Amino acid sequence: MLGFGRRHAVGEHEADGEIERVYHEIRQTLRVTGVTLNLRALAAYGPLLPALWDALRPNLDTRAFEDAADRVRAEAVGAAARIGRLDAVGGLGLGESQHRQIQMALDLYHYVNPKLLVLTALARLGFDGGTVETRRGRAAAVELIDRGVPGTMYPMEMVEEGPADPEVRALFDDIQRTLARPAVNSDYRTLALWPGYLAAVWSRLKPILARQEYEWAAQGLGDTARALARDLPYPVPLTRERVTALGVDAETVDERLAEFERLLPKLALNVALFALDWTPAAALARSPFPVERRRFEADGGRR
């Protein structure tokens, strides 16, 4: 049986077979330019990620899932606005092109983090045997969205986890220590493409992390995501028994999913705080990549 000790996350260029297939579907279904660290970490455990993805994907194709992520995103912005702007940008000497690139990078993570949070809440509900409401009996059709990465989305490029630059390496070490994380998340590694900017926002964010209002806001985001996940259209056929049958330790899978469910509200909140320096809250509360409304007769969310 595959234990769940820390393993090397599977990079996008390392993926083959079923993992390559799932990575492609993640990019297309979540409408994102790359695969984030939490999903790449799960890919290290053989059949786990394909089974998890296939169980979740019917819901992830739906407008209901997109709307749920939009609601989490708007709540994160409201919480960030109450905490207050970081005011970290002034005096950095960034050029116009750098300003635009940073804003685009923030849009990428501001879009995907709420989706990952709802996805993780849904996975835990199914895995824990929690009831996920089904609307099959209440609606003749489930509204789906078009797949595909938005053409204006920033590529998910990032600095290596072990950077050569000693200042960036020290910054990553501080982020890991402060957040008690075994690795630096994709968000920070992308922002490290502009190390002066990351250093500035991290120095402003770090003292906020210890504030009670920050913890309450993060807990509230997690509660919202779980409540919204309960009302997604399709049940999640991924039980502890099925995971065990795959040869993966179910208890440690649950521990990792719980870890992600604690982490992702804070990532969503942090990116909202970063982005408030660039964009007013009213605009930031709207999806940076809204989707067209389309309606299909759906069977399990598949097309």
Feature map (PLM): residue ranges:
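Hydrophobic alpha-helical segments
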Residues: 1-303
